[in-house]
């Protein structure tokens, strides 16, 4: 089942009262103060229901369970496309995983395969809640901050929400991590950024030290890149002033199963249309150039970066460096899906509005991340298209 419901009004995202928390596994609705009680009681009482896996008097399991409890990963935006894949990956490794998501653009169904996992704690709540953030960071050994406004369509439609939802929660998380560090507890953090921060930089290939070049403030399209650039400045300021172990990753067109086309993502839109026999709609002339990387490659890079101390305090491009035009992508999707669909062209003004500007070429330099962790993407474009098409086909009655 695909998901991607529209973002609810701003007041639904920026309430300062603590939300109810859904502690998965026993179906109870938890209030925020109950989390700590359940956690500590669960370690003492193997029979009480709780957020964490219970320690049972089995000598063959205790060492394994203690090892699991030693690493708790918090994923903000964990029911989203990338976050849900990351949660699965970390659970397979043996981590305890806390997912927090307000389900504004994420979808709980993305976690359906792991929702009953004994080491997963799913919490429906907003990370602009001070008490919630303090509680969850206090329980975590590392943080993957993925929650953000997503998709060009959403950004063009709701620039206020884009800016506020990108900047305020990041500042709140960093401030709390700084307070914890001052008390002697440093928690590594990965901050998810985006290739959008490069803006209109005219270079053929973008490296991490290149200038960020944005358009006019009268064009809402740039609000996303600017707000994520502010996130980066904040993160690196906390590294410089407080020595926090933070790494920033700029994602370049991450694709794969569970990604929805509801917010303008091009590959799922193309694949869904091709399988349904509908026209594939290409914006402008289709000569915009992008590089697509599979989510499985990306999450492995993210985990390696947060586990590499030398990566702290630096920014990394994360993606593929194999370019393809959007028009050629549409043709490739039609070919790989054996579709009879046609290609139709649509102007930006019809797709978005008169103020919209696009980026003609977006290709990353991956030398820095290769030097740091040996990263090279393993899946080619045909494999990526096939994996997305297989997902859609399996969901079609």
Kindly label every feature range from the protein language model.
Residues 4-6, 20, 40-41, 54:
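Short Gly/Ser/Thr- and charged-rich N-terminal loops/segments
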Residues 216-227, 251, 259, 263-267, ...:
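The catalytic Tyr-centered alpha-helix of NAD(P)H-dependent dehydrogenases
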Residues 253, 274-397:
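C-terminal substrate-binding subdomain of Rossmann-fold SDR/epimerase-dehydratase oxidoreductases
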Residues 20, 31-32, 48-51, 56:
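N-terminal amphipathic/hydrophobic targeting modules at extreme N-termini
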Residues 12-13, 22, 34, 45, ...:
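Intrinsic-disorder-associated, low-complexity terminal segments enriched in Asp/Asn/His/Tyr and depleted
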Residues 230, 234, 238, 270, ...:
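Hydrophobic alpha-helix immediately C-terminal to the catalytic Tyr-X-X-X-Lys motif of short-chain
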Residues 65-252, 379, 388-391:
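N-terminal Rossmann-like NAD(P)+-binding domain of SDR-like oxidoreductases, especially those catalyzing
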Residues 13-16, 27, 37-38:
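Alpha-helix boundary/capping motif
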């Amino acid at each position: 089942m695909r998901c991607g419901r529209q973002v609810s009004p701003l007041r639904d995202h920026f309430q300062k009262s603590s939300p109810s928390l859904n502690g998965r596994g026993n179906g109870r609705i938890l209030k925020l103060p109950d989390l700590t009680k359940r956690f500590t009681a669960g370690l003492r009482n193997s029979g009480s229901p709780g957020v964490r896996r219970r320690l049972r008097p089995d000598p063959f399991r205790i060492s394994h369970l203690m090892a699991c409890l030693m690493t708790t990963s918090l994923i903000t935006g964990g029911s989203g496309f990338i976050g849900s894949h990351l949660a699965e990956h970390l659970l397979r490794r043996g981590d305890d995983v806390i997912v927090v998501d307000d389900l504004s653009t994420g979808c709980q169904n993305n976690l359906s395969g792991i929702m009953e996992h004994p080491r997963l704690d799913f919490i429906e709540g907003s990370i602009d809640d001070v008490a919630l953030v303090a509680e969850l960071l206090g329980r975590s050994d590392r943080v993957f901050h993925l929650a953000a406004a997503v998709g060009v369509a959403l950004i063009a439609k709701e620039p206020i929400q884009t800016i506020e939802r990108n900047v305020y929660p990041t500042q709140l998380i960093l401030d709390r991590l700084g307070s914890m560090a001052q008390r002697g507890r440093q928690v590594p953090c990965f901050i998810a950024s985006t290739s959008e921060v490069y803006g209109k930089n005219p270079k053929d290939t973008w490296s991490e030290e290149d200038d960020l070049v944005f358009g006019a403030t009268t064009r809402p399209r740039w609000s996303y890149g600017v707000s994520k650039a502010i996130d980066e400045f904040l993160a690196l300021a906390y590294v410089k002033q407080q020595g926090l172990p933070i790494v920033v990753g700029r994602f370049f067109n991450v694709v794969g199963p569970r990604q929805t086309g509801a917010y303008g993502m091009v590959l799922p839109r193309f694949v869904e249309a091709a399988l349904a026999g509908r026209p594939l709609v290409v914006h402008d002339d289709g000569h915009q150039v992008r590089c697509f990387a599979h989510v499985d490659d990306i999450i492995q890079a993210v985990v390696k970066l947060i586990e590499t101390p030398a990566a702290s305090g630096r920014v990394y491009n994360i993606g593929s460096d194999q370019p393809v035009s959007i028009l050629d992508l549409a043709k490739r999707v039609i070919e790989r899906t054996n579709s009879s669909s046609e290609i139709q062209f649509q102007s930006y003004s019809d797709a978005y509005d008169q103020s919209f500007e696009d980026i003609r070429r977006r290709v990353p330099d991956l030398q820095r991340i290769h030097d740091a962790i040996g990263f090279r993407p393993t899946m080619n474009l045909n494999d990526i298209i096939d994996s997305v098409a297989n997902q859609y086909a399996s969901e079609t009655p």
